[in-house]
UniProtKB/Swiss-Prot annotation:
<feature type="zinc finger region" description="Phorbol-ester/DAG-type 1">
    <location>
        <begin position="163"/>
        <end position="213"/>
    </location>
</feature>
<feature type="region of interest" description="Disordered">
    <location>
        <begin position="554"/>
        <end position="584"/>
    </location>
</feature>
<keyword id="KW-1003">Cell membrane</keyword>
<keyword id="KW-0677">Repeat</keyword>
<dbReference type="GO" id="GO:0005829">
    <property type="term" value="C:cytosol"/>
</dbReference>
<comment type="pathway">
    <text>Lipid metabolism; glycerolipid metabolism.</text>
</comment>
<dbReference type="GO" id="GO:0031410">
    <property type="term" value="C:cytoplasmic vesicle"/>
</dbReference>
<keyword id="KW-0472">Membrane</keyword>
<dbReference type="InterPro" id="IPR054474">
    <property type="entry name" value="DGKD_4H"/>
</dbReference>
<dbReference type="GO" id="GO:0008270">
    <property type="term" value="F:zinc ion binding"/>
</dbReference>
<comment type="similarity">
    <text>Belongs to the eukaryotic diacylglycerol kinase family.</text>
</comment>
<keyword id="KW-0547">Nucleotide-binding</keyword>
<dbReference type="GO" id="GO:2000370">
    <property type="term" value="P:positive regulation of clathrin-dependent endocytosis"/>
</dbReference>
<dbReference type="GO" id="GO:0015031">
    <property type="term" value="P:protein transport"/>
</dbReference>
<keyword id="KW-0443">Lipid metabolism</keyword>
<dbReference type="GO" id="GO:0046340">
    <property type="term" value="P:diacylglycerol catabolic process"/>
</dbReference>
<dbReference type="InterPro" id="IPR011993">
    <property type="entry name" value="PH-like_dom_sf"/>
</dbReference>
């Protein structure tokens, strides 16, 4: 390297050259033109470095001069020296002196996390593994430039340092260095720019730039602070030069700035731009610009608390400041762009990068404010992160949260009205304005609680011919109960005689096989004759129960054939311990009225059928329990086979035994399943289907298990469950209402679960949606793919493509096609029979997986309420496959709805975990229980488009009313003798018009009503001018101008009235008198055009309207049945031209130089006013100007030339002189 540098190292002798394995061969000189070319290589030994305090160290990638060449090196920072070598254990380290060094970010599209260390002799380009590590290195390097001792706590306080935050960039126009005032080199003006204040500098000049970046605190303002009777205020903070092309001075309204030199000024806060000469004329106090409502002024940050965090006081002008969190990794790393833009618009101290320290520092800064707003720029994960930190600081009552969508899904941003994506950082001022007008809405947040334990796996089929793979005979016996439950369900729910007969046959075979299996297992496990007798008695009882059931089934069949109408729905009521009880309850009375006393006789055998079925199941249960007891005594391995059973305390057993269900509450009751035959039932739509879907949701006591936790403390809710809604994969409707539901829910598989939520751990908080199964599997695969290959998932489009690829893969593999066998679902304490599905989604907002309305609608119907994210109600839907998820993006499907409820409980069965996702973050959840309960509510900022439109209309109206500028020619105070004579003639004509109107009004009340206000105003104005004796000084011009305006308005309203139905009501003599008065009035108005200060009240095209309208016959005009259809665009265009011309006055060909100059000002071309005035360009010359004439006058810009020519064309169309 020394040879490459061309000079031996001077000074004291250096250590001997290191051996080749330890040589740092990658320290080539890298310097820009104009910097010293001599590189003095300095090295140190590891022993010398070991004696010094290391401030920061780690591996970085160092780029060399050669193309695409980089090497990993280990760097150590000590004081103002940076050391690097191949490894941390190397003997020889290269040195980089940081005494006159500067550091700048140089990432390519904010992706490779690179930064440049610039010294007088070299340029060192380094790359970190992630953005946070890069910013940590930059902060450390910037700090050691001024301080010998680096304090680690200052990492998070970088906002308040006052130093510039450099990044390398190019510019599209000539740009000048704010240090040396010379132009930046290269065609693209490549150099360094401060990401906050846009201070420009050469790389060699950056180290000499003063630390005068945008103020953040009161101390940073310094002596420039303004103190008055109202307290302290902030002055303008000026930055010189590099103004945009369209810059105009706020004082003189003339063009400022230059591309030839560094001149004129721009305020970093209010964005005002002024000439150097006009700077002193501007008010010193800064108004903070258009975003002043959102800005927290530096004067509000004036102290530090005991923990080292800045504290913000609340000045009167800052009632609801904005705290901004930006995820710099979101949106293909476009978050960096938004981070810089927000720092330019607001106080840099109120803008934070979530990837560098998280949201804690910002929330601590703002926690003293009574109210403040938060804007999260990122995806749904970023929003959840900030809300979780708000939970920990308990700030929900103080803050309101808005979302700027930068992520992939952005479901919450869609629901709140902020759109699906935001890529243009130039629209941030408009977005901040919309955020100030946003309304507040509450967002429900839900705790996802988990209790991990092993639960038994459900049977995969309801037939006896299953190929059991269990090793234990007793475990196989347990499945017989499932089969019995399934066939009993078929017998009770099916309306088809063939299905009932088939199920009865299979049921008989199942029971026989069950008895044989029990006997075989019992012989193997016990030799006691007494035990054998007990088991024989139990089997005998089982046979009796089966015979009784078949007999009752036969009676019910005969009763059904005698009636043509199907049975009505029976209301739910709890049964006693024997399975008997009064089926018609108070809730049932409310549902079906007086149907119970007069119900058909068919219900007595149906009730008996239900009781026999329950008794049969209990007999099977007793046999199973007895068998297990014997096995437990003889076989020690039974504990392993039944390891999924949860032990219950005695008090829990007693509580469960009092639960009015058919199934007993033994410790093995988890094996009682919910309708194993549900997927085999045929669809049969009974007339009672609607009552089944709604009657079961009316909150009867029998449908909810006791001790459902927080449900009792919540307001009463009619839990809405629609079983037929999932008929795409299950049986359809469930005839027999409460009877069937009682059988389907006769076993409580959750009775071993601890009811107290203290035993649960909160996995996360759900804001958007929860998914288990298929959608969670896709999200998990995508997250793994993104972790493995982050370069493949850097844009929103690529991410959506990956989701599509992974979804198509699941369409073929169907990994969770039997999810209903792995999970059990319970809504508000009521177990839900599941169809054959691949996933379950629990929705809090009506946007799922990137904008899909998976609920299938936003309106209320007969069964379900309208979905909302502020009603403390969740929507539960079934996921049948990838194709359904894809179609749901186009068509609003509703057949997969399951329920609306306040709490959701999911049991994961078996030994394997199942993918689970919350708001797009997925993981594998081990077997156990998951409960979703309401946690709290957060205030969110919702875009109110109706209010925005109303406000915009009002603002436009105000602009139109205030857009008329003052007169361009100041009128004199007193009229001259010639003008006074002319006004006398004008007054006589006006008096004649008023007299004619009053005569006609005596016989036509309609005219009096229409013109009374205009006549009275004109009369008062004339009385003010002519009513008093004329003084020697003459008439007052202000009074005369008011009179002319009022009389002109009277003439216009009279013209409009005569153009309508009034002309049909007037007599011919009256029309003639009024027409003559109008003609005389119009002639006097034309004469006023010669008086400059009186020409303003005349509308544009006045001459044209007088010549056309007054000379027409009033009768023909009023009776004309033709209407001119003018397009809206043309009307608006004409109205705009009229507004401009009315401000200028008179026909265009009569304009003077002052009117032409005013017309140029209306075109925003004030820079040409002096040129046109010097060349004496009047209205008549203006109408005939062409492109070559404008070039001769000095108009060289093509855009300005086009604007002038278009304006002349419009003037020519409306000018009568041009037409002549």
């Amino acid at each position: 390297m020394a040879a490459a540098a061309g000079a031996p190292p001077p000074g004291p002798p250096q250590p001997p050259p290191p051996p080749p394995p330890e040589e740092s061969s990658d320290s080539e000189p890298e310097a820009e033109p104009g910097s010293p070319q001599k590189l003095i290589r300095k090295v140190s030994t590891s022993g010398q470095i070991r004696q010094k305090t290391i401030l920061k160290e780690g591996m970085l990638t160092k780029q060399n001069n050669s193309f695409q060449r980089s090497k990993r090196r280990y760097f150590k920072l000590r004081g103002r020296t940076l050391y690097y070598a191949k490894t941390a254990k190397s003997i020889i380290f290269d040195e980089v002196d940081l005494t006159d060094a500067s550091v700048a970010e140089s990432s390519t599209k904010n992706v490779n996390n690179s930064f440049t260390v610039i010294t007088p002799c070299r340029k060192l380009i380094l790359c970190a593994d992630n953005r946070k590590e890069m910013e940590d290195w930059i902060a450390a390097l910037k700090t050691v430039q001024n301080k010998e001792h680096f304090e680690p706590t200052q990492y998070s306080m970088d906002h308040f340092s006052g130093m510039h935050n450099w990044y390398a960039c190019s510019h599209a126009r000539p740009t000048y260095c704010n240090v040396c005032r010379e132009v930046l080199s290269g065609v693209t003006s490549h150099g360094l720019s401060c990401e906050v204040c846009k201070f420009k500098a050469h790389k060699r000049c950056a180290v000499r730039a003063t630390s005068n970046c945008k103020w953040t605190t009161l101390a940073s303002i310094g002596k420039d602070i303004i103190e008055d009777e109202d307290g302290i205020a902030m002055p303008h903070q000026w930055l010189e030069g590099n103004l945009p092309v369209s810059a105009k001075c706020i004082v003189c309204d003339k063009t400022c700035g230059s591309v030839l030199r560094l001149q004129d000024w721009r305020c970093l806060w209010c964005k005002a731009m002024v000439h150097t000469s006009c700077k002193e004329s501007l008010v010193m106090k800064c108004p903070l610009g258009l975003c002043k409502v959102s800005v927290i002024p530096p004067t509000a940050l004036n102290s530090i608390d005991s923990d080292g965090f800045w504290k913000a006081t609340c000045p009167p002008s800052c009632t609801s400041p904005l705290l901004v969190f930006v995820n710099s990794k979101s949106g293909d790393n476009q978050g960096v762009k938004f981070l810089r833009r927000f720092k330019q618009l607001l106080n840099p101290a109120q803008v934070f990068d979530l990837m560098n320290g998280g949201p804690h520092l910002g929330l601590r800064l703002f926690q003293k404010f009574d109210t403040f707003r938060i804007l999260v720029c990122g995806g749904d994960g970023s929003v959840g992160w900030v809300l979780s930190e708000i939970d920990s600081l308990n700030l929900h009552k103080q803050c309101q949260l808005g979302v700027l969508p930068l992520g992939t899904g952005n479901d919450l941003a869609r629901v709140l009205g902020w759109g699906s994506a935001c890529d243009d950082d130039t629209q941030l001022p408009q977005i901040l304005a919309k955020l100030e007008r946003a309304s507040t809405k509450m967002l429900d947040r839900w705790s996802v609680m988990a209790y991990e334990t092993k639960l038994p796996r459900q049977a995969s089929s309801s037939t006896v011919t299953e190929d059991f793979s269990e090793d234990s005979e007793v475990q196989q016996i347990l499945f017989y109960e499932d089969s019995v439950a399934a066939h009993l369900s078929k017998i009770l729910t099916s309306d088809q005689h063939s299905v009932v007969i088939s199920s009865a046959k299979v049921l008989c075979e199942t029971v026989k096989d069950f008895v044989a299996r029990v006997g075989k297992a019992y012989e193997k496990t016990t030799e006691s004759s007494q035990e054998s007798e007990v088991m024989a008695k139990k089997c005998s009882v089982l046979k009796e129960k089966l015979d009784s059931l078949l007999k009752t089934l036969d009676d019910e069949s005969q009763a059904s054939s005698s009636l043509s109408n199907p049975p009505p729905t029976i209301a739910e009521e709890a049964e006693d311990g024997d399975g008997s009880g009064n089926i018609c309850s108070s809730t049932g009375d409310h549902l079906v009225g007086s149907a119970c006393p007069s119900r058909p006789q068919i219900f007595r055998p149906r009730e008996q059928l239900m009781l026999r079925a329950n008794s049969l199941k209990k007999a099977i249960r007793q046999i199973i329990e007895h068998t297990e007891k014997a096995v437990d005594e003889q076989n020690a391995q039974t504990q392993e086979q039944q390891g999924f059973v949860l032990g219950l305390s005695e008090s829990e057993k007693k509580d469960l035994k009092t639960d009015n269900r058919v199934c007993t509450s033994s410790v093995h009751s988890e094996s009682c399943v919910i309708a194993k035959g549900r997927s085999q039932r045929k669809a049969s739509r009974a007339p009672c289907e609607k009552l089944v879907s709604k009657g079961l949701s009316l909150g009867s006591s029998a449908s909810l298990p006791p001790g459902t936790g927080s449900r009792d403390s919540l307001p009463a809710l009619n839990t809405k469950i629609l079983y037929p809604s999932v008929r795409a994969g299950m049986s359809g409707s469930l005839p027999g209402g409460s009877v069937i539901s009682r059988l389907l829910i006769n076993a409580d598989p959750f009775n071993a679960e601890p009811e107290n939520l203290e035993y649960y751990t909160e996995k996360c908080v759900m804001n958007n949606y929860f998914g288990i199964g298929l959608d969670a599997k896709i999200s998990l695969d995508f997250n793994n793919k993104r972790d493995e290959h982050p370069e493949k998932c850097r844009s929103r489009t690529k991410n959506m493509m990956w989701y599509g690829v992974l979804g198509t893969k699941e369409l073929l593999h169907r990994t969770y096609r039997n999810l209903e066998q792995k999970v059990l679902l319970e809504c508000d304490g009521r177990p839900i029979p599941l169809p054959s599905l691949q996933g379950i989604a629990v929705l809090n907002i009506p946007s799922y997986a990137g904008g899909t309305n998976f609920w299938g609608g936003t309106k209320e119907d007969d069964t379900f309420a309208a979905p909302s994210f502020d009603d403390k109600i969740l929507e539960v839907v079934a996921v049948f496959g990838s194709m359904q998820m894809a179609v749901s993006r186009v068509i609003k499907l509703q057949h997969h709805r399951i329920a609306q409820c306040r709490t959701v409980k999911i049991s994961i069965l078996g030994d394997e975990g199942v993918p689970v996702q919350v708001d797009g973050e997925a993981w594998i959840q081990p077997p156990g229980y998951i409960r979703i309960v309401h946690k709290n509510r957060a205030q969110t900022l919702t875009r109110d488009r109706a209010f925005e439109n109303t406000l915009k209309s009002w603002e436009d109206k105000q602009k139109c009313e205030l857009s008329r500028p003052p007169s361009f020619s100041l009128h004199p105070e007193i009229l001259s003798e010639e003008e006074a004579t002319q006004m006398d003639q004008f007054g006589q004509a006006a008096g004649g018009l008023i007299h004619s109107i009053r005569e006609i009004a005596q016989s036509h009340r309609a005219m009096e009503q229409e013109l009374a206000h205009a006549v009275n105003a004109s009369s008062k104005a004339m009385e003010r001018v002519y009513g008093k004796p004329r003084t020697a000084e003459g008439l007052n011009c202000s009074f005369v101008l008011e009179m002319v305006n009022n009389i002109r308005a009277l003439r216009s309203e009279t013209e409009l009235l005569l153009a309508g139905k009034m002309a049909l009501q007037l007599d011919p003599p009256q029309k003639e008198r009024l027409g003559a008065a109008l003609i005389e009035m119009d002639q006097q108005l034309r004469k006023l055009t010669d008086t400059p200060w009186l020409c303003q009240p005349l509308e544009p095209g006045e001459e044209e309207s007088l010549q056309q309208n007054v000379m027409l016959d009033l009768t023909k005009r009023s009776r004309s049945g033709k209407f001119r259809l003018v397009t809206k665009f043309k009307k608006e265009k004409n109205n705009k031209n009229k507004e401009v011309h009315s401000n200028l006055g008179g026909p265009v060909h009569l304009w003077g130089t002052e009117e032409v100059a005013a017309w140029l000002e209306h075109l925003s071309l004030c820079e040409y006013k002096d040129i046109f005035t010097r060349h004496d360009i009047r209205g008549s010359e203006l109408l005939h100007l062409e492109r070559r004439d404008l070039k001769d006058l000095g108009v060289t810009k093509v855009g300005h030339m086009k604007r002038i020519l278009c304006g002349i064309k419009e003037l020519s169309r409306s000018s009568p002189a041009a037409e002549a």
